Design a protein with these regions (language model features):
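Short glycine/serine/threonine-rich phosphate/pyrophosphate-binding segments
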Residues: 3-9
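Glycine-rich, histidine-containing beta strand-loop boundary motifs that form or position
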Residues: 2-3, 150
Length: 287
């Protein structure tokens, strides 16, 4: 679901293919000009969403949200929850989260929220309308979860220009190869290290195998940092840098694995809120 100022688009995605697509006038800027105040806006939103539901049919998979208004809602949700990993891409929400954030906005007010969160005035003023659209969308389509995408039309246009062989590459591994070439002391050694340790990880699932490979490629990219802070720098590199193809848990898992490349025991209290998002088994495996 891609929302702009004057429109909102829905597209069905399955097995890498785009299916049904539809556009609507459900943009926050368009709705703000509807006559009849909040009641008129609510009726307009409800009618358009009902039409969209009929045309798109039942959908119960993941809902991907694209667009600045959705990201603003997600940023406020992060703030409300005290969520420690401030990475927008792949941030997950539930319908309960959306409802709580709507109440949070009503109780605290936009001025107070704006003073505490870095969101432009133009963007945050549209949030109350955008969140009503989102709540109505979720009530009708009932997705099993909601994911924020920090990508948009620009990235989609770039992807369209890529040959298939490039599209098929793993974005995480490609990012790590680039980081190694740019920052490591011995570019290329990461793959040798991976080959050397691979027998230890013979039976791990593919999702973990790619994290092992990524950790090998990134094992030395923070060598320039002061030795006293090198472990934390490794963790920050994985959790805050522009790596694609990673869930939030996978970011933290990778960061923790890299942290322990330099330190047996972690004693950085500021990292614990993020690390606590992992299960005990995941922490142990990363270490």
């Amino acid at each position: 679901c891609d929302i702009g100022g004057a429109s909102m688009e829905l597209a069905e995605i399955s097995n890498g293919e785009v299916g049904k697509r539809i556009t609507s006038s459900l943009g926050p800027l368009s709705i703000s000009g509807i006559a009849g105040g909040k009641r008129g806006q609510k009726l307009f939103i409800s009618k358009i969403l009902d039409d969209l539901h009929v045309q798109m049919g039942s959908q119960s998979d993941r809902l991907f949200l694209v667009g600045g208004s959705w990201r603003a809602i997600a940023r406020i949700d992060m703030h409300r929850r005290g969520y420690p990993l401030h990475v927008m891409h792949e941030y997950r929400m539930t319908f309960k989260d959306i409802h709580k954030t709507d109440e949070y906005i009503k109780n605290y007010g936009l001025d107070r929220i704006k003073s505490e969160i870095r969101i432009s005035s133009e963007r945050i003023d549209l949030v109350p309308i955008a969140i009503q659209i989102l709540k109505g969308l979720i009530r009708r389509f009932k997705p099993h979860d909601i994911a924020i995408s920090s990508y948009g039309i620009r990235e989609g246009t770039l992807y369209e220009q890529m040959p298939q062989i490039m599209r098929d590459r793993d974005p995480l591994i490609e990012s790590c190869h680039f980081a190694e070439r740019k920052d490591a002391r011995l570019p290329g050694f990461g793959m040798r290290l991976h080959k050397f340790i691979l027998p230890i990880f013979n039976n791990i699932i593919p999702e973990r195998a790619r994290l092992v490979r990524a950790a090998c490629l990134l094992h030395d990219v923070s060598w320039r940092a002061h030795p006293d802070f090198r472990a934390e720098t490794c963790f920050d590199y994985a959790t805050r840098s522009n790596l694609g193809g990673l869930s939030h848990n996978e970011r933290i898992f990778l960061g923790l694995a890299l942290l322990h490349r330099y330190r047996n025991k972690r004693n950085a209290r500021q990292l614990e809120p993020m690390i606590s998002l992992l299960s005990s088994d995941d922490k142990k495996e990363a270490e």
